[in-house]
């Protein structure tokens, strides 16, 4: 069984070196090209999909659409869920990473970005840019909408969707594409690959590169490769 992950193409804020998180930022021109090229690679390699899963953030949705369009599969059903959103970077969202490092120190910012269980500063729920003020999350209980997350909390958010939707689809023989974000995909990778809390700090998933997993019947990883 195969599973394909793709992190969204380079976003406008990736290009500006800003913390993005749940802020809804568009793809950059380079990101659009990355997504299109990913679709062409998948088509050339003969990949066909039965279902696609993505987040409710524009950069991932557009990446999913472009990948499917370039591989002549735009008709494939898509399920969008907040559970595949990027990790919520709390009060860091919108800040320049270099400026944050200058203010808080390189090591503190590295820990905020890469550690498994250290939380970043909390974003005030009353902030105009808080997800509490975004109608795409209006159906969620207020205590479910995050104000900041680490990777552990992100995994706790993503895992129920993996178990309820993605894993059953794979076990049913469906060919699955997951177009999401660096940290939601890192969380899923940690789970399916059995990566330790320490080693996950070193895992980087590049933008716009299809990551192909070969899985056994129990969804254990047999191999992984980038196209």
Curated annotation (Swiss-Prot):
Keyword Isomerase: yes
Keyword Isomerase: yes
Matching Pfam families: His_Phos_1
Pathway info: Carbohydrate degradation; glycolysis; pyruvate from D-glyceraldehyde 3-phosphate: step 3/5
Taxonomy, superkingdom: Bacteria
Cysteine pairs bridged by disulfides in the record: none
EC id: 5.4.2.11
Reactions performed catalytically: (2R)-2-phosphoglycerate = (2R)-3-phosphoglycerate
Gene3D superfamilies (UniProt xref): Phosphoglycerate mutase-like
InterPro entries per UniProt: His_Pase_superF_clade-1, His_PPase_superfam, Phosphogly_mut1
GO biological process: gluconeogenesis; glycolytic process
Site (Transition state stabilizer): 181
Residues annotated to bind substrate: 7-14, 20-21, 59, 86-89, 97, 113-114, 182-183
Residues the record marks as active site: 8, 86
Matches recorded under PANTHER family: PHOSPHOGLYCERATE MUTASE (PTHR11931)
NCBIfam families linked: pgm_1 (TIGR01258), PRK14115.1 (NF010713), PRK14118.1 (NF010716)
Subunit structure: Homodimer.
Job of this protein: Catalyzes the interconversion of 2-phosphoglycerate and 3-phosphoglycerate.
UniProt name for this protein: 2,3-bisphosphoglycerate-dependent phosphoglycerate mutase
């Amino acid at each position: 069984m195969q599973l394909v992950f793709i992190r969204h193409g380079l976003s406008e804020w990736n290009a500006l070196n800003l913390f993005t998180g749940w802020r809804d930022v568009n793809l950059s021109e380079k990101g659009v090209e990355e997504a299109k090229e990913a679709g062409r690679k998948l088509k050339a390699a003969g990949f066909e999909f039965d279902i696609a899963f993505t987040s409710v953030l524009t950069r991932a949705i557009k990446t999913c659409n472009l990948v499917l369009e370039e591989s002549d599969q735009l008709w494939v059903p898509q399920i969008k869920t907040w559970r595949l959103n990027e990790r919520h970077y709390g009060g860091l969202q919108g800040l320049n990473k270099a400026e944050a490092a200058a203010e808080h120190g390189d090591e503190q910012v590295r820990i905020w970005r890469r550690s498994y269980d250290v939380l970043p500063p909390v974003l005030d729920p009353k902030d105009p840019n808080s997800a509490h003020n975004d109608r795409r999350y209006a159906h969620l209980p207020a205590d479910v909408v995050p104000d900041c997350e680490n990777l552990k909390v992100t995994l706790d958010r993503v895992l129920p969707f993996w178990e309820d939707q993605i894993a059953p689809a794979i076990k049913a023989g469906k060919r699955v594409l997951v177009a999401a974000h660096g940290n939601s995909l890192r969380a899923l990778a940690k789970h399916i690959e059995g990566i330790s809390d320490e080693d996950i700090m070193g895992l980087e998933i590049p933008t716009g590169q299809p990551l192909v997993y070969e899985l056994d019947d129990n969804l254990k990883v047999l191999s992984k490769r980038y196209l």
